[in-house]
A protein has these predicted regions:
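The feature captures the beta-strand-to-loop junction immediately N-terminal to the Walker
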Residues: 34-36
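Helix-to-loop junction immediately C-terminal to a conserved catalytic motif
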Residues: 49
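Conserved ABC ATPase "signature" region
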Residues: 98, 113-131
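Catalytic Walker B motif of ABC-type/P-loop ATPase nucleotide-binding domains
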Residues: 160-164
């Protein structure tokens, strides 16, 4: 999936937060946006994953204007790890990660096995496999963030947006 942002501008209460941000990301590319606290990094990501609408400019996914793509379709292609998560689930680490597979869960036993395999591999990739049966609420803040990252990985998105993971 290719992402292109052209001249993104956004203001809050008359204060310009984003001023002409342009960016292109092609398949299999990795980009980092750096800047001091409060410079608009999170706000920019929110425009990409449609929490905030820019005042000016356009965002394209695979050459199509984001506004012309259903929220459901764009959500199927994007996974987000937010700066702060508000998950308050009293369940296991594995259960939280399996939430990333929920849209894909199948009724056939063989396909369920594949969903669990994807979840196990995601947990291994973030170093949380050994804690898969622990309560999510018992984890430290950093461990919770790694679990949320694993959940995003299980979605197998074409675009993964990470806000200070």
């Amino acid at each position: 999936m290719e992402l292109r942002c052209d001249n993104i501008q956004y203001s809050i209460e008359g204060s310009r937060i984003l001023n002409g941000i342009s960016l292109g990301v092609s398949n299999n590319e990795f980009h980092t946006i750096l800047g001091p606290n409060g410079c608009g990094k999170t706000t920019f990501l929110k425009t990409v994953y449609r929490i905030t609408k820019p005042d000016l400019g356009a965002i394209y996914l695979d050459g199509k204007p984001l506004d012309n793509i259903s929220i459901r379709k764009s959500a199927q292609n994007m996974a987000v790890v937010a700066q702060f998560n508000n998950l308050n689930f009293d369940c296991s680490v594995l259960d939280v990660v399996m939430l990333g597979r929920t849209p894909h869960l199948k009724m056939m036993e063989q396909e369920k096995k594949e969903d669990y395999k994807i979840a196990y591999n995601a947990l291994k990739s973030v170093g949380m496999y050994e804690k898969r049966n622990r309560s999510y609420l018992s984890l430290s803040g950093g461990e919770k963030q790694r679990v949320v990252l694993a959940r995003a990985i299980t979605q197998q998105p074409t675009l993964l947006l990470l806000d200070e993971p």
